């Protein structure tokens, strides 16, 4: 678990990073650097979007799988790294 904490600290220390969170397979946040309401909102919506993206990738090619999801808007850039049991979500300023 110390390795996970160290990795999260390293990511959080990058310039422009607003917050990080780890979400379990049910979409429940288990680690976050953001406030509670923001965390719950992002976790639920991004979990749903990631599951849809995963399903779409598999529909196109059943041998393939989603490895990374990146969304860039005017305000933020959101990066999602899905794993079997967890999602790692990083939110940063897009201009950094």
UniProtKB/Swiss-Prot annotation:
Instruction: State its location(s).
Output: Cytoplasm, Cytoskeleton
UniProt keywords, alphabetically: Acetylation, Cytoplasm, Cytoskeleton, Dynein, Microtubule, Motor protein, Transport
The organs and tissues expressing this protein are described as: High expression in heart, brain, placenta, skeletal muscle, prostate and small intestine; moderate in kidney, pancreas, spleen, testis, ovary and colon; low in lung, liver, thymus and leukocyte.
Q: Which domain of life is it from?
A: Eukaryota
Q: Which GO terms describe its biological process?
A: microtubule-based movement
Query: What are its GO cellular component terms?
Result: centrosome; ciliary tip; cilium; cytoplasm; cytoplasmic dynein complex; microtubule
Q: Which residues carry this modification: N-acetylalanine?
A: 2
Subunit composition and interactions:
Homodimer. The cytoplasmic dynein 1 complex consists of two catalytic heavy chains (HCs) and a number of non-catalytic subunits presented by intermediate chains (ICs), light intermediate chains (LICs) and light chains (LCs); the composition seems to vary in respect to the IC, LIC and LC composition. The heavy chain homodimer serves as a scaffold for the probable homodimeric assembly of the respective non-catalytic subunits. The ICs and LICs bind directly to the HC dimer and the LCs assemble on the IC dimer. Interacts with DYNC1I1 and DYNC1I2. Self-associates. Interacts with DYNLRB1.
Name of protein: Dynein light chain roadblock-type 2
Q: Which organism is it from?
A: Homo sapiens
Q: What is the lineage of its organism?
A: Eukaryota, Metazoa, Chordata, Craniata, Vertebrata
């Amino acid at each position: 678990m110390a390795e996970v904490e160290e990795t999260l600290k390293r990511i959080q220390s990058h310039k422009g990073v607003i917050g990080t969170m780890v979400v379990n397979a049910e979409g429940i946040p288990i680690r976050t650097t953001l406030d509670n309401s923001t965390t719950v909102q992002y976790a639920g919506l991004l979990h749903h979007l990631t599951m849809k993206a995963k399903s779409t990738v598999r529909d196109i090619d059943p041998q393939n799988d989603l490895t990374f999801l990146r969304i860039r808007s005017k305000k933020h850039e959101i990066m999602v790294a899905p794993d079997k049991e967890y999602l790692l979500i990083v939110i940063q300023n897009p201009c950094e």
